[in-house]
């Protein structure tokens, strides 16, 4: 099983497991993102499950193209919990991973942040690009940082299978008059607004 550059990991000793993510081949991300490298499979789409005591890879979970560049991974803080979340950077999707009744591990997509159609940017669509995820200490909220869209999101994950967006704060990003980017279609917004120049 070839490695595509491990990025982050989280472990749960109670379940004798460590799970890691894979960003991509270093020769690709060191030069900057090239969509041809994505199409060629040079960026990761798996999370990797290890036996914690034996320090051995036991399972690879394929997240598919919607899971390109899985970066940050977080178990719930409860040490007996056998589930958590992983954020896939490029297409801004979050997957819930969990231990199945058979004892192996699985994952499914629970959050999908759509790209925005834009003018005045390098591409006709701008993905959110997830750069970090964080669990609240009480395991109730999951926080996401959307680098290009410029927002920080709070999801209620009391039901981890069905996260619910409960807060959003815009802190920057590329969708501002200063950058000259105009949103022409946003699947999440009903009303369009723009921040005035100051």
Where are these regions (language model features)?
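Surface-exposed loop and turn segments in beta-propeller and other repeat-based domains
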Residues: 1-4, 57-67, 106-125, 166-198
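Asp-box/WD-like beta-propeller blade repeats and closely related beta-sheet repeat scaffolds
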Residues: 1-13
